[in-house]
């Protein structure tokens, strides 16, 4: 090989050395998959991710490693996923709160656009919301709670399990629709919110069912209403908000898997199939049920449409209520 030819070959090698080889959907996955959860360990999102990861790694034949990247209400982990290589080896399992839908209108400086920088893979599940009170307050109905709030304007305290969550915006909407001025106390998660509810520091809480399920069963908390379209199988005697005259109050925190923009559509379809199969397995169904959660089966397109609708819905609630991250 003459010198000119050799230099040309070396030049081509140097120019292409930094370009990663394309990922083949036919051989995917060929190494472990990272599943980012943008919240701390122990919460509903983390529990669902670990349950799903255990079943997925059996069907995919590669480890699925859950990595918690908490911070900024879930934005840090979500942004890290959006900026990851679009090779199918970094996924996001997140909730409907600030990072993906509900709180987006409250956080104008988010560094990504959900449906532009991320690709929906699948839905995962949802959990009911329930309006609960401390039974020591002797409020045995929604009407009794509203009457108490109106009798003591600005004094009855409601816990907000997180600013920018569905519970936060629904509490703002509750105040608007009932005309009852309430005192909203923000918390950093359901755990501390429920502790203060049990201790009588706050009077009421619109809370994720998994966080209060056992406390309701034990009688330490009283459920006044379910914020779902149907009554809870756990507490069939508790009416829905719609039954009580508030049809807007039908909402469930939901969970979805996303991938970075540009991920091979064949990989998205493959992951969707494996996730949906896992969600129908006995192990996952039972583990979710223990958390008060229900698996949700959806295609990537259905997931995209649902998230788009949710973004619009909660943006409307923010506009109407004037809710803020404060």
From Swiss-Prot:
One of its Pfam families is: TctC
Per UniProt, which keywords does this protein have?
Periplasm, Signal
Q: What domain of life is recorded for the organism?
A: Bacteria
List localization entries: Periplasm
- InterPro entries attached to this UniProt entry: BUG, Bug_dom1
Q: What is its main location?
A: periplasm
CDD domains found in the cross-reference section: PBP2_Bug_TTT
Q: Which residues form the signal peptide?
A: 1-25
Gene Ontology CC annotations of this record? periplasmic space
Family, similarity comment: Belongs to the UPF0065 (bug) family.
Q: What is this protein called?
A: Protein BugT
């Amino acid at each position: 090989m003459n010198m000119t030819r050799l230099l040309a070959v070396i030049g081509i090698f140097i120019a292409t050395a930094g370009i990663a080889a394309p990922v083949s959907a036919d051989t995917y996955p060929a190494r472990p998959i990272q599943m980012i959860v943008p919240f701390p360990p122990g919460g509903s999102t983390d529990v669902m991710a670990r349950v799903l990861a255990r079943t997925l790694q059996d069907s995919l034949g590669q480890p699925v490693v859950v990595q918690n990247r908490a911070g900024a209400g879930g934005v840090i982990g979500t942004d890290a996923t959006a900026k990851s290589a679009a090779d199918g080896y970094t996924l996001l399992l997140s909730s409907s709160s600030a990072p993906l839908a509900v709180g987006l209108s409250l956080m104008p400086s988010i560094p990504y656009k959900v449906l532009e920088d991320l690709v929906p893979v699948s839905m995962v599940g949802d959990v009911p919301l329930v309006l609960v009170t401390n039974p020591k307050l002797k409020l045995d109905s929604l009407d009794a709670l509203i009457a108490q709030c109106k009798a003591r304007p600005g004094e009855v305290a409601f816990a907000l399990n997180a600013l920018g969550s569905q519970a936060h915006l629904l509490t703002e909407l509750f105040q608007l629709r009932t005309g009852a001025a309430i005192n909203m106390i923000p918390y950093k998660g359901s755990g501390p919110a429920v502790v203060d509810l049990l201790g009588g520091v706050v009077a009421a809480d619109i809370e994720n069912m998994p966080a209060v399920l056992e406390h309701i069963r034990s009688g330490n908390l009283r459920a006044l209403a379910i914020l779902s379209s149907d009554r809870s199988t756990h507490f069939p005697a508790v009416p829905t908000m719609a039954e009580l005259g508030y049809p807007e109050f039908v909402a469930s925190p939901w969970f979805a898997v996303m991938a970075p923009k540009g991920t091979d559509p064949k990989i998205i379809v493959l992951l969707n199939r494996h996730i949906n199969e896992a969600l129908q397995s006995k192990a996952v169904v039972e583990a979710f049920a223990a958390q008060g959660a229900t698996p949700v089966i959806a295609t990537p397109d259905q997931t995209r449409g649902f998230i788009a609708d949710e973004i619009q819905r909660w943006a409307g609630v923010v506009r109407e209520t004037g809710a803020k991250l404060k």
